[in-house]
Amino acid sequence: MSTQLASNIYAPLYAPFFGFAGCAAAMVLSCLGAAIGTAKSGIGIAGIGTFKPELIMKSLIPVVMSGILAIYGLVVAVLIAGNLSPTEDYTLFNGFMHLSCGLCVGFACLSSGYAIGMVGDVGVRKYMHQPRLFVGIVLILIFSEVLGLYGMIVALILNTRGSE
């Protein structure tokens, strides 16, 4: 094996695969969570739109909150991609760390999107019958959204460990 292709034990040639997998996991899973939240909430909005069209604008809050989840994944994916380079040694530690960053934010946003979708769908339908539920629904949506934010915070903390 030539000296050019030889790698040290801490930076094997396959290590960047894990970084790319983390980048992909961050985007795919967080966008999947955003899509689930948007679709489930959108079903409820479409359901009330036929009865009370004036409530549609106030009912878009779950859809907007679901879209923010994809931004969390995008931020982490961009940070991971910024650390990937074909010319520098990429350690196995960094590869696993970036994979865990992507999975952390991805699964957190996936679960958050599912929660937002469920609360958004049922909440919008019940809001049509009882407008006083609006504040409670928004609070539950905020607590559902913060699950994805927790995943992003942990991913950012993990990402800073690799660049030390």
Swiss-Prot record:
Record topology, Cytoplasmic segments: 38-59, 121-132
GO cellular component, one term: fungal-type vacuole membrane
GO function terms (MF aspect): proton-transporting ATPase activity, rotational mechanism
Subcellular location: Vacuole membrane
InterPro entries per record: ATPase_proteolipid_c-like_dom (IPR002379), ATPase_proteolipid_csu (IPR000245), ATPase_proteolipid_su_C_euk (IPR011555), F/V-ATP_Csub_sf (IPR035921)
GO terms classed as biological process: endosomal lumen acidification; Golgi lumen acidification; proton transmembrane transport; vacuolar acidification
Disulfide bond annotation, renumbered to this chain: none
Transmembrane segments: 15-37, 60-80, 99-120, 133-158
Any Pfam family the entry gives: ATP-synt_C
Membrane topology term: Multi-pass membrane protein
Residue intervals on the Vacuolar side: 1-14, 81-98, 159-164
Annotated site residue numbers, Essential for proton translocation: 145
Keyword list, A-Z: Hydrogen ion transport, Ion transport, Membrane, Transmembrane, Transmembrane helix, Transport, Vacuole
Subunit architecture: V-ATPase is a heteromultimeric enzyme composed of a peripheral catalytic V1 complex (components A to H) attached to an integral membrane V0 proton pore complex (components: a, c, c', c'', d, e, f and VOA1). The decameric c-ring forms the proton-conducting pore, and is composed of eight proteolipid subunits c, one subunit c' and one subunit c''.
The family this protein is said to belong to: Belongs to the V-ATPase proteolipid subunit family.
More about this protein: Present with 538 molecules/cell in log phase SD medium.
Function noted in UniProt: Proton-conducting pore forming subunit of the V0 complex of vacuolar(H+)-ATPase (V-ATPase), a multisubunit enzyme composed of a peripheral complex (V1) that hydrolyzes ATP and a membrane integral complex (V0) that translocates protons. V-ATPase is responsible for acidifying and maintaining the pH of intracellular compartments.
Protein name (Swiss-Prot/TrEMBL): V-type proton ATPase subunit c'
Gene symbol of the encoding locus: VMA11
